[in-house]
Each structure stands twice: as C-alpha cells, then as structure tokens.
Regions:
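Core-facing hydrophobic residues within beta-strands of well-ordered domains
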Residues: 5-6, 276
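A generic structural signal for well-ordered coil/turn residues at beta-strand boundaries
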Residues: 5, 123, 141, 228-229
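Residue-level detector of alpha-helix boundaries and kinks
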Residues: 4, 29, 74, 88, ...
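Conserved beta-strand scaffold positions in the cores of enzyme catalytic domains, especially
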Residues: 6-10, 294
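A cross-kingdom feature that marks ATP-driven nucleic-acid transaction machinery
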Residues: 143-295
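Interdomain hinge/linker elements that couple catalytic modules in large macromolecular machines
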Residues: 10-157
C-alpha cells in the first residue's frame, strides 16, 4: 500500500531433498519428478493429486484443459511486455539454440536486439547464462543460454513442439517423444543438481566453491586439437584441489574406465597443473566395479 514495504522476500525454489519427503519417493524417482516440477510447492500439490508422474503429466500439462498448460504465459504476463517474443525466445533455447548467434538467427533479428529480453529472463530466474569454469561471465563468445527452471525446461522441450498434437488430443506422438527423450532430458537436470550438490559443500573433507561446466579445445597426447567437456568442475576454497566430475543418468557404468578418462582429459588442461585433481563420478546406479569417488 502506498508503495511502501517493511520487507521484500524473494522466495527461492525448494530444493530436491524435500520433494522426496513430500511425495514419498525413492531417490531415483525424486530426481525424475524434480526434473519436471522443479521446486514450486503448487506444482508438487498438483502432482500429489495424481497416482503417478505419467498421470500427472497428462492431467496437468499435456492437456488443453490442464492447470499448467498455459503456465509460462501466465507467469510472463506479470513481468514482461512482449509475451510472444519472450515465449519464442524460450522455445528456441528449449529446443537447442543456446548461443546468442543461434538465438538471433532463429529470431531473424540482430543479436543486439536480444540483449535486453535475455537479461530480463535471467533476472526473473527463467534463464541462466552458462560460461565455462574460470571464464569471465561477461565473455559473450563462450556463453550458452539455458532454461534455468526445471518446469519451464520441460515445458519448452516437450509441450511447445507438440502443441498441435495436444490440441488435437493425439497422445501417440507425444508418448513417443517422451519415451525417446525424457531420460536424456532428466540427465541434463541431473547434471545441474550435481553441480549444486558440490557448490559450497564438503566433499571428502574439502570445501569447494561454485561448480560449473567446462568445455573447450585442448592439445591431446598426439599433439592434436581435441574438444573436451566436463560436467562438473570446481576449485577448492583453499585453491589446492580441482574437482572434475562426470554425470551419468544411465544404467551401470564402468567406473574405472570413466575415472581414467576423466583424469586423462583433466591432465590436458594447462590451468589444471597447479591443482591436485580430484575425479568424481555422479552416477544413477552403482558402477559395475569399484570406482573410487562416486556419488
């Protein structure tokens, strides 16, 4: 009232462990559910009213009568002026256009025109700007734009591309899309959860700073350029250790093989030579063998 406030509260998303308790889930199902609903209690409540994740998807999201079918548009109405352009940008990013140049090409307009709407979406928490570990966040050349909110990410990957099928009540093409791509989608959310789990936490007796991804070109053992990527990379607060991680949301993996490859890639990084390298595997299932550092 009168533009005055005693306190302003910015409510963050509720974290993963609580959805397991709220919906009485095992760890694996909790991660899959969180990949869809994120940390919004209202979405959890809607999920709780259905018998299964599949039932909840069809009842709430994948139906024209679903409570959440138009959810992103409703959220944008409160905070953005050009809802159509905003949703279009989110659609392109959700379906794989992650570089500024790619988004601009899909939008058919100069990249400079997108700076303001992209920043707005980041400020609202819908997008995140992803840059490799150790790179200044202002480095536009290396930046990738990703949808930050799990529900929004699911919506723009599975709902928007299939909207015509949803509106015609055609379940089969949507079921095929979910069967083909849902596990891959969860794996991307799993990576983010793993980075969050490392950030600021004690891992094997060492506290680490902000965990990020790293990708780029290195010179390999054969003196040839090689593109490498790390799902998780974090520096210890005492700057002695560099944690490098591989995330897998698949069936049993060969832990020793993954660890060996992690160390091989890490030893190719010039900036890593000043650290003690700590390899870490983040696996959906226990590895086939004893792999050392696994979570």
């Amino acid at each position: 009232l009168y533009g005055r406030a005693d306190e302003i509260m910015k409510l963050a998303l509720i974290r993963l462990p609580y959805i397991q308790e709220a919906l009485s889930l095992d760890a694996m199902n909790a991660i899959e559910e969180y990949a869809v609903w994120g940390g919004v209690p209202r979405y959890w409540e809607l999920r709780e009213n259905q018998n299964s994740l599949n039932d909840a998807l069809w009842h709430n999201i994948l139906s024209v009568n679903g409570t959440l079918y138009e959810e992103p548009i409703k959220l944008f109405q409160d905070d953005v002026k050009d809802i159509v352009k905003t949703s279009t940008i989110m659609s392109y990013i959700g379906t794989g256009a992650n570089r500024l140049s790619e988004i601009a090409a899909r939008c058919n307009e100069p990249a400079t025109n997108l700076s303001r709407p992209l920043k707005k979406l980041i400020d609202l928490g819908f997008l995140a700007k992803d840059v490799p570990f150790g790179i200044d966040e202002k480095n536009a050349k290396k930046s990738l734009y990703k949808i930050a909110d799990p529900f929004m990410a699911f919506y723009y990957q599975f709902v928007v591309p299939n909207r015509s099928f949803i509106e015609l009540g055609r379940r089969l093409p949507i079921e095929q899309a979910l069967t083909a791509h849902f596990s891959e989608y969860v794996s991307m959310q799993w990576e983010k959860l793993c980075r969050d789990a490392v950030t600021g936490n004690l891992v094997n007796g060492v506290v680490y700073g902000k965990a990020k991804r790293w990708w780029g070109s290195v010179i390999n053992e054969d003196k040839k350029p090689e593109q490498v990527e790390f799902d998780v990379m974090a520096e210890s607060l005492d700057k002695k250790y560099l944690l490098v991680g591989e995330c897998k949301w698949t069936t049993q993996e060969n832990g020793k093989q993954l660890t060996t490859e992690l160390l091989r890639k890490a030893n190719l990084l010039p900036f890593a030579k000043k650290y003690t390298i700590v390899p870490m595997l983040f696996l959906k299932n226990a590895p086939k063998d004893e792999a050392g550092n696994t979570m």
